[in-house]
């Protein structure tokens, strides 16, 4: 048993291997009451049987908190508006799910009068930082227990053996022991053969949300998305709330094998890791939103927003959601979205998302100016004066070089 004594500990619980064995481990080593807290951010089928499992494993109580609506409206949609992709590919599915869960953990810890909050994140991963930054933001004095940084278990194989020895029910084996994270936005897969970059992912065995390209339909499907101020509000002409819209897009996108990426990323803690991510609905929303922005944003705003998007992605990935900078960037992004309203038609086919036409009352595209045909608005002779002025720095530089030579 560890030296420090806690009376009541709040555990961020998922029902997976890590948090399942942590319940008996906490009781054995700290002699404490364990209250499990599940943040429902759209895990769907993973929630089935969690209450019974947590109690059977030794928890005195379990909270299953429905955070799905808040997750979509306050975390997912603002990140889509930002156009944030970590290292140009990752749509941040795990990253922005952690702050909302951590915030609720602190609230329940206060409600229950708990001494500490415990999470099951490894000492090599990003999630430990994301959870603990958020916890410290809302309660700097809260004690945090991170078993992976203290216990003698060093691998998932040893975790499985611990579960067997302590009669903890699990539904995985040594052979299917991928580390997964699922929510309404995405499903990630890490570990096993994926730890070796030379290995091609076994998509037919890994994928759960998406079809492989071979199994995707041979016929394309067209959909129409409506946006209001950068937020998707309708699908095929039907107004939908954010949760329902994303659920529908996940089904449609998954059917067509959309949103699967195999990525080697730079973790916050310094190492590289490899993962396969399934984000079918999210990938459709990102493509639609980005294309609509191209129609509605002016050049200077669009180009500067690219810089903001990169920083926004880093902040989210690093667990810095609850920071003044993230809030300031969100304020800028919100301003840019005032005219991102309209409809976009998309063609979905075997992993591809193809723009099939879009309209907006705020469109900055003018056929009168852009046409290659005859027009009476744009005087092409004006281009000569513009080029003379625009090229002036280059001309001066060239003349200086000639003098030196």
UniProtKB/Swiss-Prot annotation:
Its EC number is 6.3.4.5. InterPro entries: Arginosuc_syn_C, Arginosuc_syn_N, Arginosuc_synth, Arginosuc_synth_CS, Arginosuc_synth_type_1_subfam, AS_cat/multimer_dom_body, Rossmann-like_a/b/a_fold. L-citrulline binds at residues 90, 95, 126, 130, 179, 188, 265, 277. It catalyses: L-citrulline + L-aspartate + ATP = 2-(N(omega)-L-arginino)succinate + AMP + diphosphate + H(+). The gene is argG. SUPFAM superfamilies: Adenine nucleotide alpha hydrolases-like (SSF52402), Argininosuccinate synthetase, C-terminal domain (SSF69864). Homotetramer. One of its GO terms (biological process) is L-arginine biosynthetic process. The keyword Kinase does not apply. This is Argininosuccinate synthase. Keywords: Amino-acid biosynthesis, Arginine biosynthesis, ATP-binding, Cytoplasm, Ligase, Nucleotide-binding. It comes from Clostridium perfringens (strain 13 / Type A). Its main location: cytoplasm. Pfam families: Arginosuc_syn_C, Arginosuc_synth. It is found in: Cytoplasm. Belongs to the argininosuccinate synthase family. Type 1 subfamily. It is an enzyme of class 6 (ligase). L-aspartate binds at residues 122, 126-127. GO terms for cellular component: cytoplasm. ATP binds at residues 12-20, 120. One of its GO terms (molecular function) is argininosuccinate synthase activity. Pathway: Amino-acid biosynthesis; L-arginine biosynthesis; L-arginine from L-ornithine and carbamoyl phosphate: step 2/3. The keyword Cytoplasm applies.
């Amino acid at each position: 048993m560890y030296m420090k004594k806690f009376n009541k500990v709040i555990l961020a619980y998922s029902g997976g291997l890590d948090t399942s064995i942590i319940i008996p481990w906490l009781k054995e080593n700290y002699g404490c009451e364990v209250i499990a807290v599940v943040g429902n951010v759209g895990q769907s089928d993973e929630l089935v049987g969690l209450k019974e499992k947590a109690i059977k494993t030794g928890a005195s109580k379990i909270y299953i908190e429905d955070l799905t609506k808040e997750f979509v409206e306050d975390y997912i949609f603002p990140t889509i508006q930002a156009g944030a992709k970590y290292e140009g590919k990752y749509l941040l599915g795990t990253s922005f799910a952690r702050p909302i869960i951590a915030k609720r953990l602190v609230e329940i810890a206060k409600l229950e009068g708990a001494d500490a909050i415990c999470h099951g994140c490894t000492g090599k991963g990003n999630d430990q930082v994301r959870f603990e930054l958020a916890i410290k933001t809302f309660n700097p004095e809260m004690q945090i227990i991170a078993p992976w940084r203290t216990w003698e278990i060093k691998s998932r194989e040893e975790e499985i053996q611990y579960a067997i020895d302590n009669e903890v029910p699990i539904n995985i084996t040594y052979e299917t022991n991928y580390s997964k994270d699922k929510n309404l936005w995405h499903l990630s897969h890490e570990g096993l053969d994926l730890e070796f970059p030379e290995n091609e992912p076994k998509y037919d065995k890994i994928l759960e949300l998406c079809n492989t390209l071979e199994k995707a339909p041979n016929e394309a499907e067209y959909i129409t998305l409506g946006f209001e101020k950068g937020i998707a509000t309708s699908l095929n002409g039907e107004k939908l709330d954010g949760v329902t819209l994303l659920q529908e897009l996940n089904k449609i996108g998954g059917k067509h094998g959309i949103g699967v990426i195999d990525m080697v990323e730079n973790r916050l803690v310094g190492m590289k890791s490899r993962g396969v991510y399934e984000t079918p609905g999210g990938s459709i929303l990102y493509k639609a939103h980005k294309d609509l922005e191209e129609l509605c944003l002016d050049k200077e705003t669009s180009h500067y927003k690219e810089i903001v998007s990169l920083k926004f992605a880093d902040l989210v990935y690093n667990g810095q959601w609850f920071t003044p900078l993230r809030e300031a960037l969100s304020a800028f992004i919100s301003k840019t979205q005032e005219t991102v309203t309209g409809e976009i038609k998309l063609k979905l086919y075997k992993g591809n998302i193809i723009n099939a036409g879009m309209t907006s009352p705020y469109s900055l595209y003018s056929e009168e100016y852009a046409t290659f045909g005859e027009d009476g608005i744009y005087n092409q002779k004006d281009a000569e004066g513009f080029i003379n002025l625009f090229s002036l720095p280059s001309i001066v530089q060239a003349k200086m070089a000639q003098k030196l030579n």
